[in-house]
Design a protein with these regions (language model features):
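An amphipathic, aromatic/His-enriched active-site/gating alpha helix that lines ligand/cofactor pockets
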Residues: 65
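RNA-contacting regions in translation and RNA-metabolism proteins
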Residues: 1-55, 68-92
Length: 92
């Protein structure tokens, strides 16, 4: 079962903070960036939410920015022996 962000290790919190800083650097409305981590036994899902106007900036043309961020998360996860998944949430 998934657990809340408070159970993340210090290194996992650093990765969450890294994602937050990367997203804030990409968007026009950095105050709208929110990252929520949902931890499972073998995977931590990082849910990224941005201002609706900035959604395309974190996805990028043909998903290139999102793919690059996922690559960074994958490399960090290998070092921690943990899998990180990025979900980019849009306003419903």
């Amino acid at each position: 079962m998934a657990s809340p962000t408070s159970n993340l290790s210090r290194k996992e919190l650093a990765i969450k903070d890294l994602l937050t800083e990367i997203a804030k650097a990409l968007v026009d409305h950095p105050e709208g960036v929110q990252v929520r981590a949902v931890e499972g036994s073998h995977v931590t899902v990082l849910e990224l939410k941005t201002h609706p106007e900035d959604l395309g900036k974190v996805i990028g043309r043909e998903g290139r920015i999102a793919k690059a961020i996922r690559t960074l998360l994958g490399a960090a996860g290998m070092k921690l022996h943990k899998r990180f998944t990025l979900e980019i949430l849009d306003e419903d």
